[in-house]
């Protein structure tokens, strides 16, 4: 009996000891976890684009067509030509109504930033609209064929994408114009209009970038398009604006993170 009681006591002491030791270990582990995820880890994972002070604490694929950082260009066509975003929806901002519903649509996730940017532009007195949003592969094919017929292939290629190579197909890009289509509608002079100047200077505050700048035609392989804006989210948009780099130029850099 005595021996049994002693044994029991020893077991109880051992169990209590184990529980206490586990508790101490657990809190020590939690403490070190916290230390690892706060400032040090953040600093290590943040992306800094050279020439910008912005710390980008998010990261997205540059290849996945559903990613807000995807690069779709002549060099990097969509892997799946039939790609169509799952969350396409008709935008609520002013848009060119004589276009098919598809083209009046963008991805749902762009909507809050788009409405905020248009509201700010309207407040400045600029009556603007979305002239073109999402374009399916077939739609782009139709446009490219008609431009080729009108201007010849070489000229058409400077301003119109081959189907599968247009970022309009991601539902993250849009063309912006004055509602008055006589005012530099999808023309280079739009960049010199008050709305064009304002958009170039403020789009990044809403997560958009001027995708084909005048001084980067050799990099983007597209002519200067002061009307074409692309959603990438605020941190990257601000970093690109500050640094002067295009999305194409930072692609390899973003992929390292
Ligand atoms: Zn465009």
Set out the residue ranges of the language-model regions.
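Extracytoplasmic cell-surface/polysaccharide-interacting catalytic and binding patches
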Residues: 2-132, 137-257
């Amino acid at each position: 009996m005595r021996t049994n009681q002693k044994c029991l006591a020893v077991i109880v002491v051992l169990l209590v000891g184990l529980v206490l030791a586990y508790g101490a270990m657990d809190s020590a582990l939690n403490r070190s976890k916290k230390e690892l995820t706060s400032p040090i880890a953040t600093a290590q994972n943040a992306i800094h684009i050279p020439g910008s002070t912005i710390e980008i604490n998010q990261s997205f694929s540059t290849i996945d067509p559903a990613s807000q950082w995807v690069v779709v260009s002549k060099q990097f066509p969509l892997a799946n030509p039939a790609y169509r975003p799952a969350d396409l929806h008709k935008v609520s901002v002013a848009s060119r109504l004589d276009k098919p519903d598809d083209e009046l649509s963008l991805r749902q996730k762009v909507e809050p930033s788009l409405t905020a940017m248009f509201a700010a532009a309207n407040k400045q007195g600029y009556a603007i609209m979305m002239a073109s949003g999402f374009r399916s592969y077939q739609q782009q094919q139709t446009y490219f064929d008609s431009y080729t017929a009108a201007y010849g292939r070489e000229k058409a290629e400077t301003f119109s994408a081959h189907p599968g190579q247009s970022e309009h197909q991601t539902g993250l890009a849009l063309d912006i114009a004055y509602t008055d289509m006589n005012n530099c509608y999808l023309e280079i002079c739009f960049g010199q209009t008050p709305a064009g100047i304002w958009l170039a200077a403020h789009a990044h505050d809403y997560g958009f970038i001027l995708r084909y700048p005048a001084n980067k035609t050799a990099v983007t392989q597209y002519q200067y398009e002061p009307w074409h804006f692309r959603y990438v989210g605020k941190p990257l948009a601000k970093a690109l604006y500050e640094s002067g780099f295009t999305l194409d130029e930072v692609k390899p850099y973003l992929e390292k993170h």
